[in-house]
């Protein structure tokens, strides 16, 4: 499995009939850091989301998160991916689609996750480390959130 992602996006025709509007292999892959490739499947920039837009929201240029919205992406972490401790202003729903990877927290604690595991990342500083011999593929949905607060201290996005 390379980062070869089929995007299926539904919508409606002018009569309100459900149709498949997009059925393609996503070609807009970007390298976020050496060893980490990502492709956005879909994004939204409002809550509630607009289900009537004609724009291909998977091709919108977006950073890690979308202010007031969501980002659905597939990420490939290759073995030896460059470290990047970071925190986002989002709640991230993560599914390990294939492979395995270690998530490192800011105090050095590591958690090993593997294919089929599910994670909810709630604005914590973390890093992804792939010590294996094969790529790890994560499906990630990022939902914009307020910065995390702990002990009365705001923990803003960084990295």
Where are these regions (language model features)?
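Short beta-strand His + acidic residue motifs that chelate non-heme Fe in jelly-roll/DSBH
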Residues: 83-85, 103-104, 112, 126-132
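Short acidic-glycine-tyrosine-enriched beta hairpin
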Residues: 107-123
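A short hydrophobic beta-strand segment most commonly corresponding to one strand
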Residues: 92-93, 118-127, 133-150
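N-terminal leader/capping segments at the start of a protein or of a new domain
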Residues: 1-50
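Glycine- and acidic-residue-biased ligand/ion/polar-headgroup-sensing regions
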Residues: 89-107
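Conserved short histidine dyad/triad with adjacent acidic residue
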Residues: 25-27, 54-58, 70-89, 122-125, ...
């Amino acid at each position: 499995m390379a980062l070869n992602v089929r995007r299926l996006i539904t919508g409606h025709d002018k009569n309100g009939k459900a149709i498949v509007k997009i059925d393609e292999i996503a070609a807009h892959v970007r390298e976020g850091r050496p060893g980490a490739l990502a492709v956005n499947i879909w994004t939204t920039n409002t809550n509630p989301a607009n289900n009537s837009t004609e724009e291909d929201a998977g091709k919108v240029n977006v950073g890690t998160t979308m202010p007031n919205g969501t980002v659905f992406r597939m990420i490939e972490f290759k073995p030896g991916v460059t470290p990047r401790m970071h925190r986002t202003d989002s709640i991230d729903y993560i599914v390990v689609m294939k492979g395995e990877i270690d998530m490192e927290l800011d105090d050095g604690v590591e958690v090993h996750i593997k294919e089929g595991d599910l994670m909810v990342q709630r604005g914590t500083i973390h890093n992804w480390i792939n010590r294996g011999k094969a790529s790890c593929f994560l499906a990630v949905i990022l939902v914009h959130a307020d910065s995390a607060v702990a002990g009365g201290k705001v923990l803003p996005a960084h990295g």
